[in-house]
Regions:
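Cytosolic regulatory regions of ion transport systems
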Residues: 1-467
Length: 467
């Protein structure tokens, strides 16, 4: 396992996590896997033991706001402090204490809608550098999913000049059975396939590989070619007119607000009268129904005329049933909040493709922030500008600005001396105002911005991609 260094070469970057719940546990897995020095704090000794037994890290039982405990954990030498307890106020207070004790970067998870208007105050006055709202972030992810009936992930680089998408190949699709060298001819578009997920095995393809039914492919293209490709794959974006959201949870709250602001009609269903009343007070334009989302008769009635259904209750089991009801009633755009991976598999088999998790969204956002901070301030070969995670984090795409000391600068990609590590591909080169989908005649120069896609490695700088 490699250790990522920060600032002084030879010094491992320390990360402190307060909160050993599901998010804290999953975050600990990622942080230790990436080689950081991790310390975990929680009031529950069993949770602390579970994390320290599972991962290479230190654990302390106690209050993450306590200055004495934070000093014992080495707060003065820590680079990142993350508070992910289930209590918003505790997370804010812990970050404020950590900042006063000298930590470089503080990250707090806050879920309550009441903090939406307090973001600048919390960052400016209370020492919280980054506020992550897992529920709002998940709501935004869910709404992006509803643009298509099919499973599509889509991100943009270079102010929208370059698009990166992940799509699943259907049996009757034009790419099923096509070898990579023939892809552009079949699509009549210039794209580059960067990675393939085949039954959970993620790899960077070669010219000999053939696309198979069920593959999830990640590809890069300029906007016009991306639209042409999606049309060829029969994946079309359709305007949403009406959505049914089951569950007046925080995720349901945020989704309702976003959709209404976009002029989309929203029906909210919840079995708690008090929550229904609150939703109606916050969103008078919404149609709020006090009822049970697992009631098939109610769902059939409310889904008539709806373009999409979102299962956003606080229980995976309910969201599972709601999604299956919606599918059986012919709704083709269905999104469900699911944290249990076993349920995710079951839903996909039943044809429900849009599945998202507040836990996953929070993890990806935190890991991105940690990695960007740790992108070697003294590196001269490159600097990381942006980082995206696709395919549940198994594939990463990072934008780098090329520095003066990049070892492969000026070398044509087809030359034998241009060698990258396995599982890594340079997809796009942006130079001035031009965009180039990378090929054998491409080369990289200082000042270029490049998009690097990785299926096997976690990359901090361009030095990490050289083979």
């Amino acid at each position: 396992m490699s250790r990522f260094l920060h600032g002084d070469k030879g010094k491992v970057m320390r990360v402190i996590i307060v909160g050993a719940s599901k998010v804290g546990f999953a975050l600990a897995r990622h942080i230790t896997r990436e080689g950081y020095d991790l310390v975990v704090i929680d009031r529950d000794p069993e949770k602390v033991d579970a994390i320290t037994d599972a991962f290479d890290c230190n654990g302390y039982v106690g209050n993450g706001c306590c200055s004495e405990l934070l000093r014992k954990c080495g707060i003065d030498s820590a680079s990142v402090f993350v508070a992910v307890t289930k209590d918003d106020e505790t997370n804010i207070l812990c970050c404020s204490a950590a900042k006063k004790l000298g930590v470089k970067r503080t990250i707090a998870a806050v879920r309550g809608p009441e903090y939406e208007k307090e973001m600048s105050f919390l960052t400016d006055k209370l020492g919280v550098d980054l506020l992550i709202n897992p529920d709002r972030a998940a709501a935004e992810v869910g709404i992006k999913m509803l643009r298509y009936a099919e499973t599509v992930e889509r991100e943009m680089f270079g102010n929208g000049a370059v698009h990166l998408s992940a799509v699943e190949i259907c049996g009757n699709g034009v790419l099923a059975g096509v070898k990579l060298p023939s892809v552009q001819k079949v699509l009549e578009a210039k794209i580059l396939i960067c990675a393939i997920d085949r039954g959970g095995r993620v790899f960077t393809p070669s010219g000999q590989d053939e696309i198979k039914t069920g593959d999830k492919i990640v590809f890069a293209a300029e906007e016009a070619d991306m639209e042409k490709t999606l049309n060829k794959l029969r994946i079309t974006e359709r305007r949403l007119k009406k959505a049914v959201i089951v569950g007046a949870s925080n995720v349901g709250y945020y989704m309702t607000g976003i959709l209404l602001r976009r002029g989309i009609k929203v029906t909210v269903i919840d079995n708690d009268e008090g929550r229904c009343r609150q939703m109606l007070e916050c969103f008078p334009k919404a149609d709020v129904v006090n009822g049970d989302g697992t009631d098939s008769e109610l769902m059939e009635k409310e889904l008539k005329g709806a373009d999409a259904c979102v299962a956003a209750t606080s229980r995976d089991e309910e969201n599972l049933v709601i999604s299956m009801f919606a599918r059986s009633f012919g709704t083709d755009r269905i999104a469900a909040v699911i944290d249990n991976i076993d349920y995710e598999t079951m839903l996909k088999k039943s044809g429900v493709n849009h599945i998202f998790s507040t836990q996953d969204v929070a993890l990806i956002d935190i890991i991105k922030d940690v990695r960007l901070l740790d992108n070697g301030t003294d590196e001269t070969d490159s600097s990381m500008k942006w980082l995206y995670a696709l395919n549940s984090g198994s594939i990463e795409a990072a934008e780098f600005e090329v520095g003066t000391d990049f070892k492969l600068q000026g070398i044509l990609f087809r030359d034998d001396s241009f060698k990258l590590k396995p599982g890594i591909l340079i997809a796009v080169i942006m130079r001035g105002g031009s965009v180039e989908i990378a090929g054998g005649n491409s080369k990289i120069l200082p000042g270029d911005h490049v998009i690097v896609v990785s299926a096997e490695h976690r990359i901090l700088s361009l030095a990490d991609i050289v083979g």
